[in-house]
Amino acid sequence: MPLVSLSFASSSSKAMALCSICPRIPLRFRPKPISPFLSKPQICLAYRVYSSLQSTTPSTRDELGTVSIGFLGMGIMGSPMAQNLIKAGCDVTVWNRTKSKCDPLVGLGAKYKSSPEEVTATCDLTFAMLADPESAIDVACGKNGAIFGISSGKGYVDVSTVDVASSILISKQIKDTGALFLEAPVSGSKKPAEDGQLIFLTAGDKPLYEKAAPFLDIMGKSKFYLGEVGNGAAMKLVVNMIMGSMMASFAEGILLSQKVGLDPNVLVEVVSQGAINAPMYSLKGPSMIKSVYPTAFPLKHQQKDMRLALGLAESVSQSTPIAAAANELYKVAKSYGLSDEDFSAVIEALKAAKSREA
């Protein structure tokens, strides 16, 4: 197997590494179809990775305002992301299936259009943040979808979390119009979205990445360009698979500490100061101990991402027994009516299992 080549460069102002990774063995995705739009082709993706851990030079409010921005999807993530663009002085047009969710944005100065088609017809650059692959495909390609308004010279940036095949499908439909496409799923939940601290995992047309960069910097703290479409989606699924597995294990630890007579609050302090520290523990732990789950990332979305990640793993014959076990736990939690609670509510599935055993 040939070696992977690595090259590094530094800037005079700040230390920055650019890592170019060119594996010779293609990554083969054979995902299961999740919609009637999809078939079962084998897709080979070669990829090149670039990381940006610092913002690009900020544009002035006047410069930002020269690019008309569309934003589709005013949910728990889309709304704060669009708000940050508006507050930065961007010219923003919004759409959501439930019109009332657009009202706060219009109150801040956004325009409203009644369909994705109308948004892309009037905007230079359109972002889409939808709940799942089916919604992302429908908004882009369905009746009055984005593809019917977009055209050459414009760009479509899908920041939804979808599977690889769905992202490639949307990309093809967008690019068939002459427009450019970038997938840019985010790492981060409600609070990072509100604070403009998201991490963007982008792939697709490099010119669109460069055009969108100032707007990504408004909504996020860092961005990674991962090459061809599909790599951003794959990276996001791997990240969320790890996160979901960590949360399930953390929930077990909280309950075990209580069972043996330890103070779970002290457990949270201990893990937060050690080698396994993750912000998630100190952020979620106290509310989990109180059985309160304010929604930052809905449990149903975490389980959806676990399902998609397991499908990705199966497509390349990668064993993921830990993630598979965690996925079953999230499915149990959904069956208890916890779908719209924060994903930390997965602890309730473990409590129920303990009660049944007793």
From Swiss-Prot:
InterPro entries: 6-PGluconate_DH-like_C_sf (IPR008927), 6PGD_dom2 (IPR013328), 6PGDH_NADP-bd (IPR006115), HIBADH-like_NADP-bd (IPR029154), HIBADH-related_NP60_sf (IPR051265), NAD(P)-bd_dom_sf (IPR036291)
Binding site for NADP(+): 70-84, 161, 304
Coiled-coil features, chain-numbered ranges: none
Main subcellular localisation: plastid
Disulfide pairings: none
This protein's GO CC annotations: chloroplast; chloroplast stroma
Reactions accelerated catalytically: glycolate + NADP(+) = glyoxylate + NADPH + H(+); 4-hydroxybutanoate + NADP(+) = succinate semialdehyde + NADPH + H(+)
Catalytic residues of the enzyme: K236
Induction, as annotated: By cold and heat stresses. Down-regulated by ozone.
Localisation: Plastid, Chloroplast stroma
GO molecular function: glyoxylate reductase (NADPH) activity; NAD binding; NADP binding
Activity regulation statement: The ratio of NADPH/NADP(+) may regulate enzymatic activity.
Pfam families: NAD_binding_11, NAD_binding_2
EC number(s) given by UniProt: 1.1.1.79, 1.1.1.n11
Miscellaneous remark of the record: Although GLYR2 acts as an aldo/keto reductase, it has no significant homology with either mammalian and bacterial NADPH-dependent SSA reductases.
Family: Belongs to the HIBADH-related family. NP60 subfamily.
Role: Catalyzes the NADPH-dependent reduction of glyoxylate to glycolate as well as succinic semialdehyde (SSA) to gamma-hydroxybutyrate in vitro. May function in redox homeostasis and play a role in oxidative stress tolerance by detoxifying glyoxylate and SSA generated in glycolate metabolism and GABA metabolism, respectively.
Protein name: Glyoxylate/succinic semialdehyde reductase 2, chloroplastic
Native source species: Arabidopsis thaliana
Species lineage: Eukaryota, Viridiplantae, Streptophyta, Embryophyta, Tracheophyta
